[in-house]
């Protein structure tokens, strides 16, 4: 991912070959047909099988903070039913990513859905065009957007600047980052357990 802005990091695969691997319950896609030879050094994502189950021409997978903030809640399905009315979406309980998740989804009819929300994990969105995927993603993000917590004052930032002045550290660019590090509730949550394992 470190080169994603400068290079094409996607591995084009034969979708039918991937679907055949799903039927054979094989997790390793290394032998699925790679469509362009110069991509042979890249490995397909562990979640390729999940994406292949969707009928859409374009599929995007995101670990959206807004989506995850709901996907970790015990009553998230009920809340999301209300917030995502009018969008064809599916709730999927937590299962380890890769073949176990794909096997579960293969038993469900995912072809009717444009949005799949994975508990404790993220969201998968499908569309017939890139623009359609982006539009659906924006709708989901807008509906699930949460207010920003915390208030970082400029005077506090100047104190931090004086502390790091003689060190090799740089302060984060955005004030919001400082707010996150000073929020008592967030510090309590992060001190317990990881909210989403994958």
Predicted regions and their residues:
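Glycine-rich flexible loops
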Residues: 1-198
């Amino acid at each position: 991912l470190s080169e994603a802005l400068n290079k094409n990091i996607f591995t084009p695969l034969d979708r039918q070959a991937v679907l055949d691997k799903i039927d054979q319950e094989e997790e390793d896609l290394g032998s699925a047909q790679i469509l362009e030879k110069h991509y042979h050094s890249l490995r397909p994502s562990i979640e390729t099988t999940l994406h292949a189950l969707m009928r859409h021409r374009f599929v995007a997978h995101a670990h959206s903070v807004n989506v995850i903030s709901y996907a970790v809640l015990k009553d998230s399905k009920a809340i999301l039913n209300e917030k995502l009315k009018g969008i064809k979406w599916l709730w999927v309980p937590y299962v380890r990513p890769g073949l176990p998740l794909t096997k579960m989804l293969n038993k469900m009819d995912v072809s009717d859905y444009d949005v799949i929300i994975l508990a404790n994990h993220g969201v998968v969105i499908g569309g017939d065009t890139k623009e359609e995927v982006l539009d659906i993603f924006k709708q989901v993000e807008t509906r699930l957007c949460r207010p920003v917590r915390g208030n970082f004052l400029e005077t506090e930032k100047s104190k931090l600047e004086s502390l790091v002045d003689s060190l090799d550290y740089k302060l984060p660019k955005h004030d919001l980052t400082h707010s996150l590090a000073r929020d008592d509730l967030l510090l309590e949550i992060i001190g317990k357990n990881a909210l989403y394992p994958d």
